[in-house]
């Protein structure tokens, strides 16, 4: 494939592939800087503490009826029109980053703060105005979910997190989607 390209050029092309892929995959949000501002993120529901996943907030396979936690988000920068929440299981490599357990989005109006309501897991019908599925969970087989997959380790002590991102989500053709600020919150273990 690169037979007519010098070894140095080939090495540059190959080393740039992950960067190029990052700009066009995973939602396609271009970071506005190398060091993004931090959002303030906390739980809006006292049942969520960041220690243990609350009772019943796991997947149906293990008897739960999990929903995303409601979150309070502050320090949302000007220019943001949506918040994207990427859910991950840090203990299970294939679903440990980039929204392995799904990406849920919320349209917002302006800078400042927002409360993101809880939405149900394991369904494409979120039932909350202004929310949307940015990407379904990457789980497969009996673990497959059309949206958010709640913690589903069967209680093995896996660690779950949410990466919360303030973005400008392009609304017109030719616009660029931008990542403006972000923050991780530990959901807990299950």
Locate each region found by the language model:
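Bacterial N-terminal signal peptides that target proteins for export
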Residues: 1-12
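C-terminal motif of bacterial Sec signal peptides marking the signal peptidase cleavage site
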Residues: 20-22
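N-terminus-centered regions that define maturation/targeting leaders and the start
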Residues: 24-190
